[in-house]
From Swiss-Prot:
PROSITE patterns: ATP_P_PHORIBOSYLTR. It comes from the Bacteria. One of its GO terms (biological process) is L-histidine biosynthetic process. The lineage of its organism: Bacteria, Pseudomonadati, Pseudomonadota, Alphaproteobacteria, Hyphomicrobiales. InterPro entries: ATP_PRibTrfase_cat, ATP_PRibTrfase_CS, ATP_PRibTrfase_HisG, ATP_PRibTrfase_HisG_short. Belongs to the ATP phosphoribosyltransferase family. Short subfamily. It is found in: Cytoplasm. This is ATP phosphoribosyltransferase. Catalyzes the condensation of ATP and 5-phosphoribose 1-diphosphate to form N'-(5'-phosphoribosyl)-ATP (PR-ATP). Has a crucial role in the pathway because the rate of histidine biosynthesis seems to be controlled primarily by regulation of HisG enzymatic activity.
Length: 231
């Protein structure tokens, strides 16, 4: 029975993933045609490799249509409802670091914490006749963090289709929840991260589908990759 692995299809995530596999002793033989998104592992005929977008990898792991994959923890938590019941994070891989954060305009000088934001949200409707608008691509993580963790209920999520950090300046939102590596883009757009506004510290992870946990082969591959990370 073959094991299906899904890895990022391009860029530094792909390069770093292949380097992790090589350290674990898995040599991936790439196709000659760049439009071919399948590959094989030298000497491992039962391994089938797919190259997909990081978000598609998270979805397929949730469905159980791939056994192991490399993707960002932020995508796993955002894409999958009840993620821990559907997938398991086997290892953090040490690259692709980024934080999902709550950021507000710098001119909101009195707003530095989520408690301050709760006060603003409650007051916002009375002052402006509408709810506080939050631009984000991370609606699930935003709802969990605001409503469940901090008890903030009076807000509205505005779907972000472009550059989220530009939404407050454009007038389409009052604040944002977005992912950042260095914070430089937020600062360039005169936004600040709240002191307790880090929702998730994300990085690339090796993730397994829960429905594949009966497979010894999947466990063996995950263990070998973890061992390679310690070299």
């Amino acid at each position: 029975m073959s094991v299906t692995l899904a890895f990022p299809s391009k860029g530094r995530l792909k390069e770093n993933t292949l380097a992790v596999l090589e350290k674990a002793g898995y040599k991936v033989v790439l196709p000659d045609d760049d439009r071919n998104y399948r590959a094989r592992v030298e000497g491992e005929d039962d391994l089938d490799i797919l190259f997909l977008s990081a978000s598609e990898i998270a979805r397929k792991l949730g469905y159980g249509s791939v056994d192991l994959g490399v993707t960002g923890e932020d995508l796993v938590r955002e894409t999958l409802a009840h993620a821990d019941e559907r997938v398991a994070i086997e290892a953090q891989l040490g690259f692709g670091h980024a934080d999902v954060v709550v950021a507000v305009p710098e001119v909101w000088r009195d707003v530095t914490t989520m408690a301050d934001l709760d006060d603003v949200a409650a007051d916002f409707r009375q002052r402006h006749g509408r709810r506080l608008r939050i631009a984000t691509k991370y609606w699930r993580l935003t709802q969990q963090f605001f409503s469940q963790k901090h008890g903030i209920q009076v807000y509205r999520i505005v779907e972000s289709l472009g550059a989220t950090e530009g939404a407050p300046a454009a007038g389409s939102a009052d604040m944002i929840v977005d992912i950042t590596s260095t914070g430089s883009t937020l600062r360039a757009n005169r936004l600040k991260v709240l002191e307790d506004g880090i929702i998730l510290r994300s990085q690339a992870c090796l993730v397994s589908a829960r429905r594949s946990h009966t497979s010894r082969r999947v466990e063996e591959i995950a263990a070998r990759i973890r061992a390679g990370l310690e070299i």
